[in-house]
Amino acid sequence: MRDTFPLLLKTDFPAVYRDRTDTLQANLGYRCNQSCTHCHVAASPQRTEAMDRETMELLLRYLAARRIETLDLTGGAPELNPHFRELVSRARAQGVRVMDRCNLTILNEPGQEDLAAFLADQAVEITASLPCYLEENVDQQRGKGVFESSLAGLRQLNALGYGQPDSSLTL
């Protein structure tokens, strides 16, 4: 990779300052239950790359050592990583705020029937993605039936308190 810092020193580019890192985004893998045409990481059900246990342990140690406040989980569908629930539970036990970038349809997948309840029990913040409010557009981008499955996922989360007034669960 080309080092561009020396080039910046020769310009009037303003100095860049930063404070301590308080949010860490971690990609847990490229496996996903969808195959979206617009996916920037080309995630799909055929992808197998995933964060392993050793890396997860390093991540948890880093969170503690650097006093990271927020862990932002992404993928693919981060929930399909075999260590997802353990990572969430252990990060929450450290007092770390956890965000899950959820495609909503994962909540309806076989083997994930209790996922919404797990997320609520752990007070995980959900960043839900739905690329459009029109069924035809969503299904064209993400696959047939994704719009309705996404709404079903939202209903599950709403029933648990996500997005409801006076609830501490963030959607």
Where are these regions (language model features)?
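Radical SAM/AdoMet-radical enzyme domain recognition
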Residues: 53-72, 81-171
